[in-house]
Curated annotation (Swiss-Prot):
Subunit structure: Monomer.
NCBIfam families: argS
Organism lineage string: Bacteria, Bacillati, Bacillota, Bacilli, Bacillales
Keywords: Aminoacyl-tRNA synthetase, ATP-binding, Cytoplasm, Ligase, Nucleotide-binding, Protein biosynthesis
Reactions catalysed, as given in the entry: tRNA(Arg) + L-arginine + ATP = L-arginyl-tRNA(Arg) + AMP + diphosphate
Family label: Belongs to the class-I aminoacyl-tRNA synthetase family.
Chain's gene name: argS
UniProt motif ('HIGH' region) ranges: 132-142
Protein name: Arginine--tRNA ligase
Statement: the UniProt record of this protein carries the keyword Ribonucleoprotein: no
Entry EC no(s): 6.1.1.19
Gene3D superfamilies per UniProt: Arginyl tRNA synthetase N-terminal domain, HUPs, Isoleucyl-tRNA Synthetase, Domain 1
Length: 557
């Protein structure tokens, strides 16, 4: 049960009814009532600008409208202690904090389900993320996309969406041919034959390793084999090796997928031809200069796009169009793609393709993930000390730990550049946000253990009577009560960093409460049991928040 959400809905409904009772507008004319939390606590717990919104309809000054609304409000029904009109007509509400007493029992009853809502209404959403080429190690951009994507999936599911997590395997096209040729070169080199890597080949240590494994496992079996047959084997072997490595890295990063979708399957199933036929039937395909073109300018793209080149090979766009047609045919109402910043220009042509196929282009949402810069000892880390190459996701996980990487990567909006301070990420200090938040969980766990050792249990019913007496209790209760709304907002606005910020705010409120108040007071067992219930509610909520962003909640540190 979302106590704070229910109160806010009651307040909005009461404001709507008050406006109608005051004769300012009919129910049909009323705009949505917005309740904001003022930055300055002196301006109340909530504020609305409804008077300004109604000025045009009511044909009155906003301040006069505000006075008319306030005169019609039922404070008791709204759990409001007092109301003030400020500035040009803002209505500020100061809450009667007694409503907060129900927050703790609600959290204790809900447990792991606290924070769930049905704002998604079971809508089928597909989130496609990471989708790195299976030709080498996952890098930091992939890691950030994985952290943001997985957190978003968790949050969407918590908010009542039916979520499918999907990884698109780019296992067709030129890059896979280059993978096979690179494996071939490394295989022959492992046998002592000097074969150069192709110009567009892959130079990673993993390809060297694949070549050695093939030489050890099969000896010179492939030397006399026809090149086409040999490359087909090396392609499959290399793909399998790289995919297994990617899957292992993502599993260790706590990022699961429901579907691993092969690009090759689009060719084998005829889905590429189907997409091309659909576009042709709808009049968006034409031939020019020996190539096949998609008339994407009909949907606002800056130029038409080639789908089939003069030599008969496909551009990247055609299988991507077929893939998105397949997604929509599977019944997804929203397609959320999490792409690197280098794909920004690709968005208009994909939306154009979806529209040309006969679907709503707004079904596609693209979240852009910006670059990550690593810093250590105050200097930017450009290359791995161990390999002399770009730092991989695996190396960063091993260097600073999964919790730190997941938290830091989910801490900012994905479309902003991120500077990752490796020294800060491993420091045991309050300046390290992941340490600060996890320490809050360890602290409440320690309090609950101490209480158990003294045979004192928490009591949610006592929380109804003993928990709105001090400023720090009230602040902590307010933050606890906000969690379901934060999750719902993070889901609807696709902002996983809102949950990370919430976890930090809750930890901060807990530390402030702990420093100001005594929890275990043997001279006042009733208050102790009530405060233990509050501490238990913090533990549950912190666990739930951290689980959404893939971070552990340690009981001891």
């Amino acid at each position: 049960m979302n106590i704070v959400g229910q109160i806010k809905e009651k307040m909005k409904e009461e404001i709507r009814q008050a406006a109608v009772r005051a004769g300012l507008a009919s129910a049909d004319e009323l705009p949505d009532v917005l309740l904001e939390v003022p930055r300055d606590k002196a301006h109340g717990d909530y504020s609305t600008n409804i008077a300004m919104q109604l000025a045009r309809i009511a044909k009155k000054p906003p301040r006069a409208i505000a006075e008319a609304i306030v005169g019609q409000l039922d404070r008791e029904r709204m759990s409001v202690a007092r109301i003030e009109i400020a500035g040009p007509g803002f209505i500020n509400f100061y809450m009667d904090n007694r409503y907060l007493t129900a927050v703790v029992p609600a959290i204790l009853q809900a447990g792991q389900a606290y924070g769930e809502s049905n704002v998604g209404n079971g809508e089928k959403v597909q989130v496609e993320f990471v989708s790195a080429n299976p030709t080498g190690d996952l890098h930091l951009g992939h890691a950030r996309g994985a952290a943001v994507g997985d957190s978003l999936c968790n949050i969407l599911a918590k908010a009542g969406f039916d979520v499918t997590r999907e990884y698109y395997i780019n296992d067709a096209g030129k890059q896979i041919y280059n993978l096979a040729k690179s494996v071939e070169a490394r295989y022959f080199q492992a046998l002592g034959v000097d074969m150069p890597l192709p110009e567009d080949g892959y130079y990673g240590d993993d390809i060297v390793e694949i070549g050695k494994k093939l030489a050890e496992e099969y000896g010179d079996r492939f030397v006399e084999m026809e090149e086409e047959e040999r490359l087909a084997f090396f392609r499959d072997y290399g793909l399998r090796y790289e995919l297994e490595k990617i899957k292992k890295d993502l599993a260790d990063f706590r990022v699961p997928f429901d579907v691993w979708y092969s690009e090759t399957s689009l060719y084998e199933s005829g889905k590429i031809d189907e997409a091309l036929s659909t576009l042709r039937e709808r009049g968006y395909i034409y031939e020019q200069d020996g190539a096949t073109w998609f008339r994407s300018t009909a949907f606002g793209d800056d130029k038409d796009r080639v789908l089939i080149k003069q030599d008969g090979t496909y551009t990247y766009l055609l299988p991507d169009i077929a893939y998105h047609q397949d997604k929509l045919r599977r019944g997804f109402k929203k397609l959320i793609n999490i792409w690197g910043a280098d794909h920004h220009g690709y968005i208009p042509r994909m939306k154009a393709a979806i529209a040309a196929l006969g679907y709503d282009p707004e079904a596609l949402e693209v979240e852009i993930i910006q670059m990550v810069n690593l810093y250590q000892n105050g200097e930017r880390v450009k290359m791995s000390k161990r390999t002399g190459k770009a730092v991989t996701m695996r190396e960063l996980m091993e260097e600073v730990g999964v919790d730190a990487v997941r938290y830091f990567f989910a801490m900012r909006s994905g479309d902003t550049h991120l500077d990752f301070d490796m020294d800060l990420a491993v420091s045991q200090s309050n300046e390290n946000p992941v340490y600060y938040v996890q320490y809050a969980h360890a602290r409440v766990s320690s309090i609950l253990r101490q209480a158990e050792e003294q045979h004192i249990s928490y009591d949610g019913d006592l929380a109804l009577h003993h928990l709105v007496e001090t400023e720090k209790e009230i602040e902590l209760l307010k933050v606890l009560g906000d969690f379901p709304d934060v999750v719902a907002e993070a889901a609807l606005k696709r902002m996983p960093h809102r949950v990370t910020a919430y976890a930090f705010d809750l930890a901060s409120a807990l530390h402030s409460f702990y420093n100001a108040e005594k929890v275990l007071d043997l001279d006042n067992i009733e208050k102790t049991k009530a405060r233990l219930a509050l501490v238990k509610a913090v533990q549950i909520t912190l666990q739930n928040a951290l689980a959404l962003i893939g971070v552990s909640a340690p009981e001891q540190m």
